[in-house]
């Protein structure tokens, strides 16, 4: 299930970013060769508490995610507005591109009651099948481990909404590793208060409107 979800997202993402048939082949190859790394990176991202009211950890998430994209050649910055969690903003300019794509994601998650979780909500656990279907915990995969598409990774925000972040990162990795590159300019706009009602989103947009034009 993990591989299937990530792969489907990567196909959609690479098709939008690159718009070339060979981008799908590049994505397939990247997932096949790097599935173990994708899962481990995803688990690490999920281990960072991201409740919107937890200002310290939210900023830790923002800096970490921003740095991941910076390492991949994006110009990154944290957009600040008074009393608000930062927006993770990034740009990747493609020479000759005639269009710009903006990806919106939120990196905060819903508040949690740890007593209602089998494992800690920010302690990602990999299962060999659906937990309710009799699945059992297994170690994170090594480099030579074959990735089973039925594996499940349980954690807060595993679906909503950190999965798109790891998907975009690996779409970028797949395209860059294959030398295909992008056909569009890319902008990133990742919010840190969506689960809290996006109370400061309009203020962010108004203050930083020039970046989004």
Where are these regions (language model features)?
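Bacterial Sec-dependent N-terminal signal peptides
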Residues: 1-22
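Acidic/histidine-rich catalytic neighborhood of metal-dependent amide-processing enzymes
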Residues: 146-213
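Intrinsically disordered, low-complexity segments enriched in polar/charged small residues
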Residues: 8-9, 111, 161
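Generic domain-boundary/flexible-linker signal
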Residues: 16, 112-114, 199
């Amino acid at each position: 299930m993990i591989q299937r979800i990530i792969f489907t997202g990567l196909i959609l993402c690479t098709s939008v970013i690159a718009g070339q048939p060979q981008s799908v082949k590049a994505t397939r190859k990247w997932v096949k060769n790097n599935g173990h790394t994708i899962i481990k990176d995803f688990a690490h991202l999920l281990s960072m508490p991201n409740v919107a009211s937890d200002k310290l950890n939210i900023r830790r998430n923002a800096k970490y995610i921003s740095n991941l994209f910076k390492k991949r050649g994006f110009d990154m910055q944290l957009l600040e507005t008074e009393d608000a969690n930062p927006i993770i903003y990034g740009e990747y300019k493609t020479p000759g591109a005639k269009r710009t794509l903006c990806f919106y994601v939120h990196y905060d998650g819903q508040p949690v009651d740890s007593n209602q979780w089998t494992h800690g909500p920010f302690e990602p656990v990999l299962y060999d099948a659906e937990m309710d279907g009799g699945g059992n915990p297994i170690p994170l995969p090594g480099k030579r481990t074959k990735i089973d598409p039925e594996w499940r990774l349980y954690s807060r925000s595993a679906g909503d909404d950190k999965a798109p972040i790891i998907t975009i990162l690996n779409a970028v990795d797949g395209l860059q590793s294959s030398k295909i590159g992008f056909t569009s300019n890319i902008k990133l706009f990742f919010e840190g208060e969506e689960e809290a009602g996006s109370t400061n989103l309009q203020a962010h947009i108004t203050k930083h409107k020039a970046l989004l034009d």
